[in-house]
Regions:
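Short, conserved charged micro-motifs
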Residues: 14-16, 49-56
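C-terminal structural segments of small proteins and small subunits
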Residues: 52-80
Length: 80
């Protein structure tokens, strides 16, 4: 099984990296961009056959290490 995890800043948290990318895109001539938010994508190859157990384990990984839940949200997708 594979776990795909998207970690993003919570909407209320300022994103200086996103602002820098937005500014750079404007400098390169890309206009009409309202906002850029930057995050992380993590893919984990799991040695697990039970989808519910995999979801539970990855949820714990996110809470304990992969995401700073004070300022970040995360979304998990489990695939076989």
């Amino acid at each position: 099984m594979k776990a795909k995890i998207h970690v993003t800043l919570k909407p209320a948290v300022l994103d200086p990296q996103g602002k820098a990318v937005q500014h750079a895109l404007g400098s390169l001539g890309f206009f009409g961009i309202n906002e850029v938010r930057q995050g992380k994508f993590i893919e984990i190859d799991l040695n697990e056959t039970d989808t519910a157990e995999a979801q539970k384990n990855v949820e714990n990984m996110c809470k304990q290490l992969l995401a700073n839940t004070v300022i970040e949200d995360y979304a998990i997708e489990i695939t076989e």
